[in-house]
Swiss-Prot record:
GO biological process terms on file: DNA replication, removal of RNA primer; mismatch repair
Enzyme Commission numbers on file: 3.1.26.4
Keyword Metal-binding applies: yes
Record keywords, A-Z: Cytoplasm, Endonuclease, Hydrolase, Manganese, Metal-binding, Nuclease
Gene designation per UniProt: rnhB
NCBIfam families: PRK00015.1-1, PRK00015.1-3, PRK00015.1-4
Protein residues bound to a divalent metal cation: D26, E27, D118
SUPFAM superfamilies assigned: Ribonuclease H-like (SSF53098)
Pfam family, one: RNase_HII
Protein name according to UniProt: Ribonuclease HII
Gene3D superfamilies the record matches: Ribonuclease H-like superfamily/Ribonuclease H
Reaction(s) this enzyme catalyzes, per UniProt: Endonucleolytic cleavage to 5'-phosphomonoester
Amino acid sequence: MTKKAESKELPPFEYPEGYQLFAGVDEVGRGPLVGAVVTAAVILDPNNPIEGLTDSKKLTDKKRELLFPEIQEKALAWSLGRCEAHEIDELNILQATMVAMQRAIAGLNITPDFALIDGNKVPELPMAGLAVVKGDLRVQEISAASIIAKVTRDREMEELDKAYPQYGFAKHKGYPTKAHFEAIEEHGVISEHRRSFKPVKRVLGIE
């Protein structure tokens, strides 16, 4: 079965009954060797719909940049959460992602009744929550969160690229590409690199 066929067969999402305010939560940046893992939480306004919401990875940069301010303007509430590279090294990437999600939800200026989390794990939260596999494709609130998180982190990588142009962060966004491997082999690591990740440990000689 192809990936495309799988996506067509995703079951429609049924929102849990008895709740009014749903926050969608997603993360960007679990895989990169550098920078924070960034999360977003979004509560959409059912009376102010946003066209074109889907998984941020399926959108062009231009479309994400167009949707980003529209989500910020039309959502009832949105918030960012993050865990920096040093926190990822202390906690591990899974736990750091959970903490970043908790921070995003805590930052909302409206408290949701229910949190819908992309993936298969729910962090400890003060409200009910549900993990939704492929949630960024199935749940609009999660789609919106994925766009907010993706645009935010990509912009951070573009800023980091200005400070360290030799690494090519604007292009690969910190992910473990051949160009990134070659750059850290040649130039070493910077403070934003995740020292617990194997390719970085190898360059540091601590593997």
